[in-house]
Amino acid sequence: MKLSIILGTRPEIIKLSPIIRALEKTNIDWHIIHTNQHYSENMDKIFFEELNLPNPKYNLNIGSGTHGEQTGKMLIEIEKVLLKEKPDVVVVQGDTNTVLAGALVASKLKIDVAHVEAGLRSFDRNMPEEINRVLTDHISSYLFAPTEIAKNNLLREGIEENKIFVVGNTIVDATLQNLKIAEKNENVRAFFNSVVIDDDYFLLTLHRAENVDNKERLKNIVEGIFEIIEIYDKAIIFSIHPRTKKRLKEFNLFDKLKSNKKIKIIEPVGYLEFLMLEKNAELILTDSGGVQEEACILKVPCITLRDNTERPETVEVGANILVGDNKEKLIKAVEIMLNKKRNWKNPFGNGKSGERIVRILTYGKY
């Protein structure tokens, strides 16, 4: 058997790392194809070194662009590699343009597609990620669903049950494995001590197009952050995405954020550093699906700055509240989460998902 693992972003590298580690213990022929979907080295390449992962066999250097431009370039370049390598299975993870392009090329070439994190649904077709994940699921031969909720989403859409495997989420494997590394790493500890001034800080991330490309919505979120500071007197560490920084400047919101003494804006950091920031935060504010999961696993209360989530399990267990861009909801949610006991059950599995996936791809069963 021969596997092509196609990835292109930081979350994909993180969530596929447990599968890669499991593959390294086998005799399976496999390789990594990296589309380089993110244009910043800080945003993805650094993770291979941090996670002790082998370098990609292929770097496609696609970079940023419109959805059509980026996906089109990927289709062309991925096809060249798959025609050369002729794998039996292509493995993709998540909901990016890399995932859709990899799955489409493989499907056209009659190569089986294995979709890790299948069945997630926000039920919002305005999100590009929703289109990517739905299309990918419907052309996949192996659908690795993280939870029963995800499996039921797939069954409702008519996908055959014998293609669906509930394996848990590889984010649990990655979080548990790499937090230990982070806590022992002197450079990570030094970074943490240099950034964190107040022990009871909130951590903020913001990058979704529906938030940062909408001036009114972004303005509402920023104003909500200022109100939280005013009411709760908390320090906020804002790990800022390049796209978000660009929009904040464009909408004349950046200088106001930067001048607030309670807000510490930091450039994108390595995965291990970010894990430490998450683990030690009093509260996390985010629009990232992966961060919602990590917060839940790490037992840190989370508030999601979106109207919906494809991680409803985090809401069901009480680890997460959705507030969208509504300031009143945000302020109320902060009060609720600051008083919440961190005793919810992790709904994403026991950290063995990577091994399960490799067993299924190898033997066709758990």
From Swiss-Prot:
* Catalytic activity annotation: UDP-N-acetyl-alpha-D-glucosamine = UDP-N-acetyl-alpha-D-mannosamine
Pfam families hit by this protein: Epimerase_2
Subcellular location per the Swiss-Prot or TrEMBL entry: Cytoplasm
GO molecular function terms here? UDP-N-acetylglucosamine 2-epimerase activity
Record-annotated active site = H207
Keywords annotated in UniProt: Cytoplasm, Isomerase
Q: Which GO terms describe its cellular component?
A: cytoplasm
EC identifiers of the protein: 5.1.3.14
Give the source's domain of life in one word: Archaea
Task: State how it assembles.
Answer: Homodimer.
Family to which the UniProt record says this protein belongs: Belongs to the UDP-N-acetylglucosamine 2-epimerase family.
Q: Which PANTHER family match?
A: UDP-N-ACETYLGLUCOSAMINE 2-EPIMERASE (PTHR43174:SF1)
User: Under which name does UniProt file this protein?
Assistant: UDP-N-acetylglucosamine 2-epimerase
The primary gene name is: wecB
